[in-house]
């Protein structure tokens, strides 16, 4: 039955489904896991990094990028689709700044991206974008923001969220571990993001891409060495906690 309705983007199935949009959401579920955490004075983005070929330049396969000085984005899904969305969003950021002489708010650029995605769900000769995005940054009020969009064009604000292949596992971890204490300072928020990714990344820090953004500061990408140091500290704390637990039990 589905095959009669899954070819045209603009045709609903009898039970109310847009199959092409659902297929785009499946493409997202096959993408690298990405996590976003909104701290008190910081927003952290982390992405599961796939291993690259020995001769490939790692800088060309990043899943985290800046849209403007105060807004950045991580995505899961089709990289080529993301490139188009990122390019459109960057142009809109600059156009808005030239027109009204103020930078975009994080919600404004999120709504722009969501609207762009929605248009591609009801236009002939196009297909939906196969990406979900975590869009983060700071507005003039200094409050950190985190939004998530999906291929259907919806968007929501979050305290913490995950997208991609293992989003369900990471989200469950965040629901258990995201507390005010866990984001009380910048370092704890960074650790929480890494811990969440370590739930699904098997080979430790070398397969994690991490970035932070603070108020009035540009996006900061962590080097592989910095990530390894954070992972080592997390593992050391975990070992100490287990030793303390075993002593109490005896």
Swiss-Prot record:
UniProt family annotation: Belongs to the peptidase T1A family.
InterPro entries referenced in this protein's UniProt entry, alphabetically: Ntn_hydrolases_N, Proteasome_alpha, Proteasome_alpha-type, Proteasome_asu_N, Proteasome_sua/b
Keywords: Differentiation, Nucleus, Proteasome, Spermatogenesis
GO BP term (any one): ubiquitin-dependent protein catabolic process
Record SMART domains: Proteasome_A_N
PROSITE patterns associated with the record: PROTEASOME_ALPHA_1, PROTEASOME_ALPHA_2
Gene Ontology CC: cytosol; nucleoplasm; nucleus; proteasome core complex, alpha-subunit complex; spermatoproteasome complex
Function statement: Component of the spermatoproteasome, a proteasome specifically found in testis that promotes acetylation-dependent degradation of histones, thereby participating actively to the exchange of histones during spermatogenesis. The proteasome is a protein complex that degrades unneeded or damaged proteins by proteolysis, a chemical reaction that breaks peptide bonds. Required for 20S core proteasome assembly, essential for the degradation of meiotic proteins RAD51 and RPA1 at late prophase I and the progression of meiosis I during spermatogenesis.
Protein name, per record: Proteasome subunit alpha type-8
Localization (cell): Nucleus
Position of the signal peptide: none
């Amino acid at each position: 039955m589905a095959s009669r309705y899954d070819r045209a983007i603009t045709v609903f199935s009898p039970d109310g489904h847009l199959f092409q949009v659902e297929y785009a959401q499946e493409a997202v579920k096959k993408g690298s896991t990405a996590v976003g955490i909104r701290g008190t004075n910081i927003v952290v983005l982390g992405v599961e990094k796939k291993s690259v070929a020995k001769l490939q330049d790692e800088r060309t396969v990043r899943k985290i990028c800046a849209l403007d000085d105060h807004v950045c984005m991580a995505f899961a899904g089709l990289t080529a689709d993301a490139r188009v969305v990122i390019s459109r969003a960057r142009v809109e950021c600059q156009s808005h700044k030239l027109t009204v002489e103020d930078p975009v708010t994080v919600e404004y650029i999120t709504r722009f991206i969501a609207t762009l995605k929605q248009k591609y769900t009801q236009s002939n000769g196009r297909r939906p974008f196969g990406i979900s995005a975590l869009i983060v940054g700071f507005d003039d009020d200094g409050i950190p923001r985190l939004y998530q969009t999906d291929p259907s064009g919806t968007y929501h604000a979050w305290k913490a969220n995950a997208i991609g292949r293992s989003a369900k596992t990471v989200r469950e971890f965040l629901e258990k571990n995201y507390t005010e204490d866990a984001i009380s300072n910048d370092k704890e928020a960074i650790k929480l993001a890494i811990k969440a990714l370590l739930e699904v990344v098997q080979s430790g820090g070398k397969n994690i891409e991490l970035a932070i953004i603070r108020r009035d500061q540009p996006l900061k990408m962590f080097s592989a060495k910095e990530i390894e140091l954070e992972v080592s500290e997390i593992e050391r704390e975990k070992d100490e906690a287990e030793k303390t637990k075993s002593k109490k039990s005896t």
